[in-house]
Amino acid sequence: MNLLIMGPPGGGKGTQCEVLVRELKITHISTGDMFRENVKGGTELGLKAKEYMDAGQLVPDELVVAMVKDRLSKPDCANGFLLDGFPRTVPQAEALDATLKDMGIILDAVLNIAVPRGKLLDRLTGRRVCRVCGATFHVLFNAPKEDGKCDKCGGELYQRSDDTEATVNQRLDVYEAQTQPLIEYYGKQGLLKEINGDQEIGKVTQDLLASLGR
């Protein structure tokens, strides 16, 4: 089974990816990891990408697509894959479609984990970190015994700058602007499976598998 997964920051996508690849016995392809491996490993594609990155430029779509194509051609993808983090734009989706067609690969479904914005804000802005030992808490889901104080070492808990409401809203704005056209694109192809991510983790997994006939 060949799948693509989308989901907002704080939507629980990472957790679901782990379960899906285990349940479906397919390979998880995180394009972020793939990118880093190519650059770190000094592959031909990685070296080309590094040139753009060192110059402070965006890596061209055709180079990213070439990396994805190379990754999909590996033996561990023969039983199927879960593509995570790509495409991010409609032109990338079109390029991916053309690549899959060239390779004789059919995309079975596109999974979209949807969570109301208010819930995402609660999840993402509630994190607190200890200044001393780095332990992580959450004001709603894993609150410290004493407000603002680390259970483990008694250190001060603080909110990281990228967890503030303004920063989180900015990230969600970018995500929504990128993803909405993709939702429409895959919806027109009849591939889109919308999953309610505002549920218990196990129920989200159940719904994801049910949408795939499992």
Curated annotation (Swiss-Prot):
AMP binds at T31, R36, Q57, L58, V59, G85, F86, P87, R88, Q92, R160, R171. SUPFAM superfamilies: P-loop containing nucleoside triphosphate hydrolases. Keywords: ATP-binding, Cytoplasm, Kinase, Metal-binding, Nucleotide biosynthesis, Nucleotide-binding, Transferase, Zinc. ATP binds at G10, G11, G12, K13, G14, T15, R127, T136, F137, Q199. It comes from the Bacteria. Zn(2+) binds at C130, C133, C150, C153. Its main location: cytoplasm. GO terms for biological process: AMP salvage. Residues 126-163 are annotated as: LID. Pathway: Purine metabolism; AMP biosynthesis via salvage pathway; AMP from ADP: step 1/1. It is found in: Cytoplasm. GO terms for cellular component: cytoplasm. Residues 30-59 are annotated as: NMP. PROSITE patterns: ADENYLATE_KINASE (PS00113). One of its GO terms (molecular function) is ATP binding. InterPro entries: Adenyl_kin_sub (IPR006259), Adenylat/UMP-CMP_kin (IPR000850), Adenylat_kinase_CS (IPR033690), Adenylate_kinase_lid-dom (IPR007862), P-loop_NTPase (IPR027417). Its EC number is 2.7.4.3. It catalyses: AMP + ATP = 2 ADP. Monomer. Consists of three domains, a large central CORE domain and two small peripheral domains, NMPbind and LID, which undergo movements during catalysis. The LID domain closes over the site of phosphoryl transfer upon ATP binding. Assembling and dissambling the active center during each catalytic cycle provides an effective means to prevent ATP hydrolysis. Some bacteria have evolved a zinc-coordinating structure that stabilizes the LID domain. Belongs to the adenylate kinase family. Catalyzes the reversible transfer of the terminal phosphate group between ATP and AMP. Plays an important role in cellular energy homeostasis and in adenine nucleotide metabolism. This is Adenylate kinase.
